[in-house]
A protein has these predicted regions:
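Active-site-proximal alpha-helical scaffolds that flank and shape metal-associated catalytic sites
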Residues: 193-267, 293-297
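Terminal targeting/low-complexity segments that flank the catalytic cores of oxidoreductases
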Residues: 2-174, 197, 201, 222-223, ...
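Short amphipathic alpha-helical segments with heptad-repeat character
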Residues: 146-149, 153, 178-181, 185, ...
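C-terminal helix-coil-helix/basic helical segment that borders enzyme active sites and/or dimer interfaces
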Residues: 274-282
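A structural feature that tracks compact, well-ordered secondary-structure segments
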Residues: 158-163, 178-179, 237-243, 257, ...
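Amphipathic, well-ordered alpha-helical segments in soluble domains
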Residues: 151-159, 187, 232-239, 266
Length: 366
């Protein structure tokens, strides 16, 4: 009982108790009458969006005035599309304010797919299936994964650098590209993990000419997409398809298959965006053709470096000895697939294209 009394006395003397006493003794503050003028501020009230078979998706919200997506978005604040802007807000200074500079009709659906098909390299990849490989094969796998991780890092930088330059009026694109940046981070992670899990390590840095071309694109997001998708993205996608066929274990097969799934979304967005940009800008078709012609020189410099070519041939042939015959045959088949698909995409975009002399050996024969 004595202890309880002492504890109560101590509580009464505590700083908190003193604060409560002072607040109780202070005069009552006058609470202003709420004006509630904001309650009648809405561009369209009474909207009821019903979830469809896939739930309440991002695209399903585009109803009424909330589905109005103009070709130009002059508002340079962070005001959500459909909301009433506040007067006097300082501009943020977005560089990309035209729909033709960023838009792709598939962006909302790609966002939904991206958030539904997430995978975790730490726990989803069956790492226990990775077994010791012959030294030459392990070195080749590590070298290829080193260069693929470098490609992924470039994607992170490029996507993040341009995404924050886009106005909020085209939020579907901003939201999808947020997932694409996260995909690239996951790819960077998983390729490094494959290089480091099996007694090997990271290999040699790639020549990086195409990397710099993508990173230093300053003409706009569309220019960056030309290099990110039509050049680097398609090549990476083609390499991954062949790597999945020649995977040494289930872990590698899982990695390449799931990265391909993520990559397909970026390719879809990029091609849709280029199609939209060309349709709404009379000069864009020739601009894309010029950009590709400029990029050919840098692509060939990377192509002439033997490191990636030899590493892929070893994987396809199963060894250094196998690389000299079957491995190089598969590599050449892979390059033919890349050039063929590249030309098909250019034809779909109505972009005139000439295969550079160095790569004509892989071009389809008429």
């Amino acid at each position: 009982l004595v202890k309880a009394v002492k504890a109560a006395a101590k509580a009464v003397k505590s700083p908190h108790a003193e604060t409560v006493r002072k607040a109780a003794a202070a005069p009552m503050l006058e609470v202003p009458e709420p004006k509630l003028t904001w309650m009648n501020k809405s561009r369209q009230w009474g909207v009821r969006v019903k979830p469809g078979k896939k739930g309440l998706t991002l695209g399903s919200l585009n109803v009424g005035i909330y589905g109005e997506i103009p070709m130009d978005w002059p508002d340079q604040t962070r005001n959500p599309r459909g909301a009433i802007g506040r007067k006097g807000m300082p501009p943020v200074g977005y560089m990309l304010r035209s729909k033709s500079e960023v838009w792709a009709d598939s962006a909302a659906d790609l966002y939904e797919e991206a958030i539904q098909r997430r995978w975790v390299p730490a726990t989803d990849v069956p790492w226990n299936t990775v077994k010791p490989l012959p030294d030459d094969l392990e070195r080749a796998v590590c070298q290829v994964n080193t260069e693929l991780s470098q490609y992924a890092n470039v994607e992170i930088e490029v996507i993040s650098a341009w995404q924050h330059q886009m106005v909020y009026g085209y939020h579907e694109v901003k939201q999808y590209l947020a997932t694409a940046g996260f995909d690239a981070a996951r790819h960077y992670e998983v390729f490094r993990k494959r290089a480091l899990i099996n007694g090997g390590g990271l290999g040699l840095e790639g020549p990086g000419q195409v990397n710099r071309m993508i990173l230093e694109s300053r003409g706009g997001w569309t220019e960056a997409v030309v290099y990110l998708v039509l050049v680097r993205g398609l090549l990476t996608q083609t390499i991954l398809r062949y790597l999945e066929r020649y995977a040494s274990n289930e872990a590698e097969s899982f990695i390449y298959r799931n990265v391909l799934q993520d990559k397909a979304r970026l390719m879809t967005y990029g091609l849709d965006h280029l199609k939209f940009a060309i349709a709404h800008n009379e000069d864009q078709q020739q601009i894309v053709a010029t950009l590709l012609a400029i990029g050919d020189g840098l692509f060939i410099r990377d192509f002439n470096d033997p490191v990636l070519r030899e590493a892929l041939a070893i994987i396809f042939g199963g060894s250094i000895a196998g690389a000299r015959g079957a491995g190089m045959d598969v590599y050449h088949d892979m390059m033919r697939a890349y050039i063929r698909t590249h030309l098909e995409y250019c034809q779909w975009l109505d972009v005139p294209r000439r295969v550079p002399e160095r790569l004509k050996q892989y071009a389809p024969q008429d």
